[in-house]
Amino acid sequence: MDNWNSVRNVSSDRQTSKTSENPPHTSNEYSGKPEFINLSPDLEENLDEKLMSAFPGLEPHVFQHSQSPLSHKDASLLATMPSVASSNPSLISSGSSQTGSPSQSLSSNKEPSSPGISPSNDSQSQNTNHTSISANPYVNNPSHTSRNPDSGSSLNTASHEVPSSKSDVNVQMLARLKSKSRQKISSSDPLEDLRLTLTECLNPINIVQAPKECAAILVNLMSNITQDDQKLVFLDLLKSKVGNSIYSQLVDGGRKLFLPKLRNWFVSAIRSKHDELIHLILLVLANLPLTTEKLAEVKFGKPILIVKKKSTNSVIRQLAENLSELAEKSFTIEQNRENEKSSTKNDSTVSSSAVVMAPAGPAMAPSASNKPSASSTTKSSNSKSKKKVTSISGTSFFKNLASSTKPTSASSSTKAPLTKQQTNPSTPLSSIMAGLKGREKEKDKDSGISSENVSNNREELPSFRKRSSSSRQSEEIASLQAENAVFSSDPASNDEKTGNKKRKKKSVSWKPDNDLVQVKFIESLNEEGAASVKTPHIYGNARDMDRQEARVAFGSHVEDDVENEIIWYKPVPIKFEISKDEIHPRGYKCGGNERNLTPEATSEIEREKNESKDISTFNIILDLPVIREFDDSRPPAHIKLVSSDTQATTELGFNGLVQQVSENNTNAYSATSNSQLSSIFSNLSSSISDASSNVLQNPSLSIPNYSNAI
């Protein structure tokens, strides 16, 4: 608290010294320096109430007056101690408007952001008076923020003077913004960069002094904005009433690109069903000075009517309803223009492919000469030559459209010879079409004129080549003559005057029977018809044949109708005499009780029994005790040790050992046969090992030492 008091005293001393040196201005001229005034607590409270009443849909924290320029602690201190605020004018900054009247505002270092009004909010927000937040030129403008070295906080003060005329506008800042708007947004925080650029551009001073330049900057920014969040920031700052001058420049500016770009955003939002973006665009449209002609130029009426009809949001539908009257009128203008364009296009298409025809009308005397007079160039002239057309047989359709003129007098009743005369190749297509239409009308009225005579009265198609000025004049003359050329309703008089030959009617007639050269008699064969009718179709068609066959096989209809039936006869008896040995000539190697044992099979069985049998399973070996007990009645066995000195001694000792062992075991193995001797000798080594183990277990056994005897 002491630190804050010291800062307060220092700032108040500085302010006192400044005010004493520079007395306040008495005139309405803006000096460019901030003026500090003392705000009483009553004035502060009244200001909050006025702001809350002016903005009923916003939160209290939105107002800059309720935010402290220093910190949250100082803000609470100013709220609880209004006397401190009144005694410290350095904490409160005020900027004057263009008229010189002071306005009180407090702002923090962080610029306040108004909450976006979403379509889901209460409809009461639509009736909110969108008062400009930027009424003070230094609010929401980061370029006017200065740093207080004593308190370390930022205060909103004026950093440049307010221009008194248009020549004093900060040209450098506008040029910088214009060049920046032409570049793509590529910073680390594009939304913040866009917000700062728009805030500088929508500064009231710049809007009033240079609205054209500001509108150009906004249009350039719209060209570089591609993301929906950037569009929301742009429209959110533009929807508030920043000034009628900027709106009129955006709509009626030189390039007039704002409304087309805004329509593209609107159509894109409708397709992606972005309700928030649609809502902001409708709010911007509500502030623009729009007319039906301006909406019709960019075709903005139809999207508004679509949103009004198909939107599911009530707020959006209400905003579209407010603009529906203008939208309907503009849409009507659009349709009328499209109809005019289509009709003009159709007229030009039809006139380019038309053929001139001489219309029927009252007879008119031809002129003495084929050359038209000068008075025949106007529609009011009465002397006009009569133009007659004839058909030439033996040519194609287009070549047959030739016209000829015949100078005949009214009293002559004889037909003049036919002459061929081509029309001027420079006949205009409009006159050709007029002749066609007139000819069709007269043909419907005059039922007496036959179709043959009508088809003969056609002119030749014009050749497409470069036309001269004289040919154009002859075109007009020919068109006027074609309009007034008439034919008599009497076919006879018409033929006499035109000299056309009456074409014979083509008909088909049959000769009598006597004149027929060939007669063909066609008779029907009843047999074939009867046979085809009586043919039974049991299976229906080939597709259902398999199913029909199945029904025949498994149904009551057992007989086969396809095969021919033959008379049954008794078959010849067949005698089968087969011996028992022939039934199984090769025999069975397996098969149970009926197995035929052959000598080979018997020997195989015996071999298999001994092949898989283990030696240790012999009954004789299993019956012998593993360890034989010592018998005192028998003399001990004397086993001579094998000497390694001589071979004879080894052989003698081994034979003697075998002999003694065989003698001692004669009684034990007396029952063995000769076939088992081989197995006994094979187990001799095991018996010797058993004997040695017995000697170790029974100390009474003694092996004599024959070393001395040897």
UniProtKB/Swiss-Prot annotation:
CC annotations in GO: cytosol; DPS complex; mRNA cleavage and polyadenylation specificity factor complex; nucleus
Record-annotated membrane-spanning stretches: none
Biased composition (Low complexity): 86-108, 361-383, 401-420
Region (Disordered), start-end ranges: 1-42, 85-170, 361-510
Keyword NADP: no
Major subcellular site: cytoplasm
Known partners and oligomeric status: Component of the cleavage and polyadenylation factor (CPF) complex.
Chain's role: RNA-binding component of the cleavage and polyadenylation factor (CPF) complex, which plays a key role in polyadenylation-dependent pre-mRNA 3'-end formation. Involved in poly(A) site recognition. May be involved in coupling transcription termination and mRNA 3'-end formation.
Name recorded for this polypeptide: Cleavage and polyadenylation factor complex subunit C74.02c
